[in-house]
Amino acid sequence: MKMIVGLGNPGQKYAGSKHNMGFMVVDGLAKRLNLTIDKLEFDAATATTRLNGEKIFLVKPQTFMNASGRAVRELMMFYQIQLDEIFVVQDDMDLTLGKLRLRKRGSAGGHNGIKDIISATGSDEFCRLKIGIQHPKRQRVVDWVLTPFSKTDQPLIDDAIEKADDALEDWLNGMPFDQLMNKFN
C-alpha cells in the first residue's frame, strides 16, 4: 500500500495559492492516473486505485494546513498504512522557485502542515517532496503563501509540478528512494 498526501488548504479561496502546491501536484498525478479525488473520508478528499498490484491512495486533507496530521493519522490507522508507505508533498519557502527536494525524514523546517503530521504520527520518518516557492522579499509570509503565483512564474511552476509528478510515478512504480533523490534533487 502507498499513500501520497498533498498539503494545502481547502476551498476556492485558496485554490492556486503557493501554499496549495501539494494539492496541485496530487491533482496532476490524479489526472495522469485518470482518477478523481472526490471521496470524502477522515477529513480528507481521497482517490484510490491499484498499480502494479498495490493499492494506492491519493489524499488531500480537508482540514486547514495546520491540522493536516489528523487526516493522515486517521487514514493510516483505518487502512493500516505504515509510515514508510507515505509520501507527503509540500511547498517550501527556503527553496528557490520551482526547485524540487526529496527527503526521507527530518524536522518540519518551519512548515506547520509537516509539524502537525509529525505530531499526529509521532514520527518524522516519512518521505517528503518539497517544491520551492521561495521566500518573500518584503511581503509578510502569511500573505505570500496564500497568494497565487504570478503569470510570469506560472510556466516554471507548471514544469515543477510535471517533474514532481514524474518523481511520484517513479516511486509508485518501485524506484528506490535513494535513486529518486539522485534523479530529482
From Swiss-Prot:
Reaction equations catalysed: an N-acyl-L-alpha-aminoacyl-tRNA + H2O = an N-acyl-L-amino acid + a tRNA + H(+)
Keywords for this protein: Cytoplasm, Hydrolase, RNA-binding, tRNA-binding
Gene Ontology biological-process annotations: protein quality control for misfolded or incompletely synthesized proteins; rescue of stalled ribosome
EC annotation from Swiss-Prot or TrEMBL: 3.1.1.29
Site (Stabilizes the basic form of H active site to accept a proton): residue numbering on this chain: D91
Cellular component aspect of the GO annotation: cytoplasm
Binding site for tRNA: Y14, F64, N66, N112
One annotated GO molecular function: tRNA binding
Site, as annotated: Discriminates between blocked and unblocked aminoacyl-tRNA: N9
Pfam families associated with the record: Pept_tRNA_hydro (PF01195)
Cell compartments where the protein resides: Cytoplasm
Purpose of the protein: Hydrolyzes ribosome-free peptidyl-tRNAs (with 1 or more amino acids incorporated), which drop off the ribosome during protein synthesis, or as a result of ribosome stalling. Catalyzes the release of premature peptidyl moieties from peptidyl-tRNA molecules trapped in stalled 50S ribosomal subunits, and thus maintains levels of free tRNAs and 50S ribosomes.
Oligomer and partners: Monomer.
NCBIfam families assigned to the protein according to its UniProt record, in alphabetical order: pth
PANTHER family: PEPTIDYL-TRNA HYDROLASE (PTHR17224:SF1)
HAMAP family in the cross-refs: Pept_tRNA_hydro_bact
Family: Belongs to the PTH family.
Protein name, entry field: Peptidyl-tRNA hydrolase
Gene: pth
